[in-house]
Amino acid sequence: MSANNYLFSGSIVAIVTPMDSSGEIDFVRLKSLVEHHIAAGTDAIVSVGTTGEAATLSIDENVKTILKTVEFADGRIPVIAGAGANATSEAIVMTKLLNDSGVAGCLSVVPYYNKPTQEGMYQHFKAIAECTDLPQILYNVPSRTGSDLLPETVARLAKINNIVAIKEATGDLSRVAKIKELAGEDFIFLSGDDATGLESIKLGGQGVISVTNNVAAADMAKMCHLALNGQFEEAEQINQRLMALHKNLFVESNPIPVKWAAYRLGLIDTPTLRLPLTTLSEHLQPKVEDALKIAGLL
């Protein structure tokens, strides 16, 4: 199946949620970010995922931010809603609120902190999928959740009609072939790890849900599109230029560094985050700035 035949593929930005200095959401800047990504060739936007600070926004703020993003996109770029929670009932409430929102799908994270079994994860995602017709993207990020959604469980979930994809953020490249083997070639594999994103496409993945895209949107779009067309050498040249960013945007917990980088580039007005996250430590700012320079962004 070609990349164009997949519902989700290419360079997908896990977009930051811009805030003013008091921590209120800056919807004017959010609109400008959406325009920026459309102009740069980004293939889709994930609204209020990990990078969008979903964990420190209220449900009302989450929904409002998603709806505003859909409004600003105006049908020109698909918007995927972060709709996960570690309580299945809460995730269902959030998902139902989005049923008629115009989103292209929902990204639902493995429940965090309470560490369910594989059967618990299966039942969690099954219950969410059954409450909606919206396409569902599973989100596996064990470094944050404390639990790993195994390929065998993904394969079980892939049998549910509207569970169509996974965002795999383990960085384990063997997962691409394993998930494709068990879940089928039609099941969409999206890397959630910028540093191994290109390699995952080479191995049969469909794209990257990217943090780096926030500050290097045009480069990430070009890299992903080249790779999906089999032009790996040209894609690798871009990837090498971005590699310092892929790594240094995680010198502190995401989205701390990427918000500072977006601020440094003038894409947002402040690097403000909601507590308990605080602005990038001063001694690490030169590392991120150097990565921006290596990428040719400064």
UniProtKB/Swiss-Prot annotation:
Site note Part of a proton relay during catalysis, residues: T50, Y113
Source organism: Pasteurella multocida (strain Pm70)
Keyword annotations from UniProtKB, A to Z: Amino-acid biosynthesis, Cytoplasm, Diaminopimelate biosynthesis, Lyase, Lysine biosynthesis, Schiff base
EC number: 4.3.3.7
Molecular function per GO: 4-hydroxy-tetrahydrodipicolinate synthase activity
Subunit and partners: Homotetramer; dimer of dimers.
Name of the gene this protein is made from: dapA
GO CC list: cytosol
Record's keyword annotation contains RNA-binding: no
Intracellular or extracellular location(s): Cytoplasm
Name the record gives this protein: 4-hydroxy-tetrahydrodipicolinate synthase
Top-rank EC class of the record's enzyme: lyase
Main location: cytoplasm
GO biological process: diaminopimelate biosynthetic process; lysine biosynthetic process via diaminopimelate
Reactions it catalyzes: L-aspartate 4-semialdehyde + pyruvate = (2S,4S)-4-hydroxy-2,3,4,5-tetrahydrodipicolinate + H2O + H(+)
Pathway: Amino-acid biosynthesis; L-lysine biosynthesis via DAP pathway; (S)-tetrahydrodipicolinate from L-aspartate: step 3/4
Binding positions for pyruvate per the UniProt entry: T51, I209
Known role: Catalyzes the condensation of (S)-aspartate-beta-semialdehyde [(S)-ASA] and pyruvate to 4-hydroxy-tetrahydrodipicolinate (HTPA).
Transmembrane regions: none
Assigned protein family: Belongs to the DapA family.
